From Swiss-Prot:
Biological process annotations from GO: cell surface receptor signaling pathway via JAK-STAT; cellular response to amino acid stimulus; cytokine-mediated signaling pathway; fat cell differentiation; intracellular signal transduction; macrophage differentiation; negative regulation of CD8-positive, alpha-beta T cell differentiation; negative regulation of insulin receptor signaling pathway
GO molecular function, one term: insulin-like growth factor receptor binding
Gene name of this polypeptide: SOCS1
Tissue: Expressed in all tissues with high expression in spleen, small intestine and peripheral blood leukocytes.
Annotated spans, Kinase inhibitory region (KIR): 55-66
Record SUPFAM superfamilies: SH2 domain, SOCS box-like
Protein name from the UniProt record: Suppressor of cytokine signaling 1
Amino acid sequence: MVAHNQVAADNAVSTAAEPRRRPEPSSSSSSSPAAPARPRPCPAVPAPAPGDTHFRTFRSHADYRRITRASALLDACGFYWGPLSVHGAHERLRAEPVGTFLVRDSRQRNCFFALSVKMASGPTSIRVHFQAGRFHLDGSRESFDCLFELLEHYVAAPRRMLGAPLRQRRVRPLQELCRQRIVATVGRENLARIPLNPVLRDYLSSFPFQI
């Protein structure tokens, strides 16, 4: 019992001997509350300057539909080479047979597409104009509602200006060859009369051309 009291006393003395530490004033405390910081305004982002483009404004929704349909068909045809340059197109056609052709983007500001073809004198490029909702080649008066009807016309013309297209893939899928053969046999105007299921009929109608 005495030993316990002695330990307690010693603890009491040592505790009392330690000086009390006053809490240091917080840097954030003050006599008056600090005003909330105002959010900095975001820097103004300058509007992007309109880039140069040869795509002009469509005059009607019908023109827009024709161009978007032509673009979709070009993506599916296999002989659309996109932004290939004139020099690049001519180099690819140089060793090909006469009549071989491809379609690419035109570099002219007033045209969407250009036709590059291997002629007897060498490769050449012709602008494809789109005016009043119709497509025609530069220097020709014959115009067509669809770009691929224009191509079919010059493939089947007596002078046979166009021959086989230069495809990016040399080996075509069998289903594309079958579709081309069916369209050539029955004609695209009769595709709806073929007794097929809707899936096959839609596939035939997605590219109803003989090219």
